[in-house]
């Protein structure tokens, strides 16, 4: 139905794959799991394994080729941009956004910069919640060439981040042009 009507579908499946891994020193989200133990799904009888959830999501993309999907949070592939690129190549009806996973991009600036250039028509700005102070970190990662700065939330990232220094045209697409293409009823003059 959405495909027939030209309505994009935002789809959020699973959570970070680390929430299914053992809570030990090899899990980069261990501190978040310590703070919020209800986010650990590794021993759940109710929540399916991560890969099963993602496979089901990809089956939906395959079955509904005429529907545009916005795969939230880089499809939880921010740690593997090569895999995410292959995913976008496989599913031309999928775009993505990077709400809550900017840290994964800021720790691999060269790879992330090239990924954004290569897939500039398939990436949209995303944010899980409105907190004005957090936007500065997003803008700093995307727009600057700053080095070795902190992420705003310690439970997500114990590494420093670096700016991607994206070209202006890529930034415009990520910030608003891609959204205007997907949602043509948004007044374009808001962005001129």
What does each of the following model-derived ranges do?
Residues 45, 51-59, 64, 68-192:
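H/E-rich (His + Asp/Glu) clusters that bind or coordinate divalent metals
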Residues 1-83:
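Divalent metal-binding pocket/active-site signature
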